[in-house]
């Protein structure tokens, strides 16, 4: 378990929550590697909750500046929940349902089938309310991460 901390980059656009949450995800993932002495190569997948395409790009750029390249290991549930080519979803899905559906569906199935042995699952969240959005207050992000590992053969 890697508990995250609230990260506020001062972003105020409630229509771009992925970018608001990405700095928290980057901080938590970076902290996880530091705390456990691991690197992206130690995991089959590094999964975030619902950053979408824009937030994913921010996450990857922030980690790259720290010398961390997630490469093809990164997956975002907000992107995976839709077929963006067929469904015109723009940035992808948003909300905790993305994490739940993708984790409990394809990810755990792939673990059961042995396609994924070890993954970081980093749930993302935005700290906001209707009132804070109406008042144009900054939207902070939070992210906590767990490692899921397949036991046995």
Which residues fall in each region the model found?
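Phosphate/pyrophosphate-binding loops at sites that engage ATP/ADP/AMP, CoA/4′-phosphopantetheine
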Residues: 28-42, 110-111
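Internal helix-turn-beta structural module
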Residues: 99-100, 105-135
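Conserved catalytic cysteine-centered active-site region
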Residues: 5, 65-102
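Short glycine/threonine-rich loop-to-helix capping motif typified by GTGT followed
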Residues: 51-66, 131-138
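Condensing-enzyme catalytic core mediating Claisen C-C bond formation in acyl metabolism
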Residues: 1-30, 35, 72-79, 88, ...
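Electropositive phosphate-/nucleotide-binding environments in soluble metabolic enzymes
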Residues: 15, 19-26, 53, 97-101, ...
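Glycine-rich beta-alpha junction loops
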Residues: 2-7, 47-53, 125-126
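A structural signal for small-residue-enriched, beta-sheet-centric alpha/beta enzyme cores
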Residues: 21, 37-40, 47-57
């Amino acid at each position: 378990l890697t508990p995250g901390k609230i990260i506020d980059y001062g972003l105020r656009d409630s229509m771009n929550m992925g970018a608001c949450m990405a700095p928290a995800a980057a901080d938590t993932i970076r902290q996880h590697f530091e705390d456990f002495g691991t690197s992206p190569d130690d995991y089959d997948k590094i999964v975030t909750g619902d950053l979408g395409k824009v937030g994913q790009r921010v996450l990857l750029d922030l980690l790259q500046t720290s010398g961390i390249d997630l490469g093809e290991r990164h997956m975002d549930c907000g992107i995976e929940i839709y077929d963006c080519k067929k469904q015109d979803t723009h940035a992808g899905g948003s909300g905790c349902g993305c994490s739940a559906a993708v984790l409990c569906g394809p990810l755990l199935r792939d673990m059961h089938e042995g396609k994924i042995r070890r993954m970081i699952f980093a749930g993302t969240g935005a700290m906001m309310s209707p009132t804070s959005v109406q008042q144009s207050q900054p939207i902070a992000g939070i992210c906590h991460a767990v490692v899921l590992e397949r036991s046995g053969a």
